[in-house]
């Protein structure tokens, strides 16, 4: 990972390790969870000095879903509540730089946009096996990491989401996602050691990685004998008309 980070940094690019663990969850699981969307959405609305229609609509919709079984006052009441809450949270954040607050305090302040018991019930009802405390702990750990490098709240939110970074993950973790361009690292026998024992499973993994790319996929290898170790996979690429480039 450090070698990859250094290589990307030479071109002004950052990496986001979606396999990094925060307690029981990976970063990928943290970033896609609805509890994260709620907490970070509220913080964005409170802190970032520009209109964020997507964040507003997404956060408002989440609040309505959390409160719907208990509150029948409708969208206008929820919108007024969110606007007032974001204004109060902005004051709270302005009174303390990130270096003077704890991640647990920030989570508590942002998540209090809805009733704690209602929020817990909502999260537990979304997916079988979801553990509210584990998700909460993971978000706090990620916030803590993001708050270490800066006292500016805008930078904290950017660091948390790492939106400008290139995500790196295993093929299996990429299921259900789609990217413009996918780069598969090291298509050779050393990284694909399990292929020899179970070629069909290896092909399935290969196609999972291939199908994540909406427009372009690049398979790399540093081994001059990679073709001989994975002949079936390279034959598929050849049949598809894939171009080969020697970068050395």
PLM features: residue spans?
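ATPase/helicase motor core of nucleic-acid motors
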Residues: 1-125
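C-terminal accessory regions
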Residues: 79-80, 88-96, 188-248
């Amino acid at each position: 990972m450090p070698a990859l980070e250094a290589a990307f940094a030479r071109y002004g690019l950052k990496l986001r390790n979606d396999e990094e663990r925060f307690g029981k969850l990976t970063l990928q699981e943290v970033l896609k969870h609805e509890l994260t969307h709620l907490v970070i959405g509220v913080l964005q609305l409170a802190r970032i000095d520009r209109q964020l229609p997507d964040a507003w609509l997404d956060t408002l919709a989440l609040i309505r879903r959390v409160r719907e079984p208990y509150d029948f006052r409708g969208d206008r009441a929820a919108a007024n509540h969110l606007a007032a809450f974001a204004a109060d949270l902005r004051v709270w954040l302005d009174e303390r730089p990130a270096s003077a607050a704890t991640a647990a305090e920030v989570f508590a302040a942002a998540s209090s946009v809805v009733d704690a018991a209602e929020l817990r019930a909502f999260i537990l009802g979304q997916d079988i096996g979801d553990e509210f405390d584990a998700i909460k702990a993971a978000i706090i750990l990620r916030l803590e990491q993001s708050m270490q490098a800066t006292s500016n709240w805008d930078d904290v939110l950017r660091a948390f989401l790492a939106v400008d970074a290139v995500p790196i993950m295993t093929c299996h973790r990429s299921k259900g996602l789609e990217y413009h361009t996918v780069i598969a690292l090291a298509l050779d026998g050393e990284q694909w050691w399990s292929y020899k024992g179970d070629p069909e499973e290896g092909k399935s993994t290969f196609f999972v990685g291939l199908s994540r790319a909406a427009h372009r996929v690049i398979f790399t290898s540093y081994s001059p004998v990679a073709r001989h170790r994975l002949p079936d996979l390279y034959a598929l690429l050849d049949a598809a008309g894939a171009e080969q480039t020697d970068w050395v």
